[in-house]
Amino acid sequence: PKSIRELSSLFENDCIFINRQRGSGTRLFLDFKLGELGVSGDQIRGYQNEEYTHWAVAASVSSGYADVGIGIKAAAVSNGLEFIPLGQEKYQLVVPESQMENNSGIPKLLALLDSSVLKNRIEQLGGYDVSMMGASMKIGDNIN
C-alpha cells in the first residue's frame, strides 16, 4: 500500500518502519546500506522502534504497528507478508582442524548439515541457499 519497493522507499514514502536492535546483523546491514545512500536513520520514521527477532519485526508489520521492516524471508512468509530481497548473507561454521579429528561430534554435525532431510526442511522455509551446506573446506578456499 505504501509503494515500498527498495531501501530508498523508507525515507521517500510516509511509512512507519520497525527496526532490529542495535548490534544485530540486520541493523548493521541496514546502517551500512543507508550510509551508501548518504542517509541517516533519523530520516526514517520509526527507525528508533526496535524488535529483537525477525519474527517480531514481521509480527509488528502484520499487526499494523509498522508498515515495513527488514528481516528474513521465512519470517515474512510465515506472517503472510510480501518479501523484497535487499541482499544475501553467507555463513560458515569455522572449526579448528584439530577438532575435526579429535571431536566425534563435529563429523556428526557436518553429516547432519549435509543431509538431504535437513536441507529440504530449510529450503521449505524459503530464502535459503543450501547448496554448500555441510561442505567442508579449508580457510583460504574459495567460499563464494
Question: How should these model regions be labeled?
Answer:
Residues 1, 15, 89-93:
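Small-molecule pocket liners
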